[in-house]
């Protein structure tokens, strides 16, 4: 009798302590949640769509995780070992098994349909009026090639830059990506762009900047001992600043190409 009273009192104390802890921690957890889910700044047109899918998945899995853990703790407490209590066994509940099989399947189908729309925007709706840039990754740098005044690639007036990608704000950019040596991963976190650069294969991706600024280009694939230093920079310019930068690059390249000839004539 005494042990039963003590057990009941301990149960009440534990429930009260857990309730108090939950009430105290709930505001802190709710306040911290946005920081846990915080992603890099959005600077491309489709970044909000990508983040929307990510946040939806995080909320769904987060709620399911909390519910499952609470049920688990409840069962651990309710069916804990007690003196004189005989364990009972059950085959299961077919109705519950059907529910928790169908419900996750429906959630997966919903997420697949929503993700399909975002995937179509990024991978299948390549803009026609876009700036074309060729990108080649190598250990351990990014090489960018712009068409020159003739508007064609692989001609003498092509503009080449190392680890520097520029384009105007509000204009779509189509990148043709490949690699010179090993697999690299072209990663622009703020643009929500991440695509492998594979030797012998050309992959096309696109994005459009929504604000002027300067961000880092990372390689997100371990590509050798110098992987840590393989980074470049992407600069989104105003249209006027972009044209000025492009003209400066063309002039510098032309001057550099002419320098050996001038030296030879002298």
Model-found features: residue ranges?
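N-terminal secretory/membrane targeting signals
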Residues: 1-34
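Intrinsic structural disorder
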Residues: 1-4, 61, 251
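Small-residue packing motifs within transmembrane alpha-helices
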Residues: 15-18, 57, 70, 100
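Non-transmembrane, membrane-proximal soluble domains of secreted or membrane proteins
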Residues: 30-56, 76-266
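Alpha-helical transmembrane segments
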Residues: 54-79
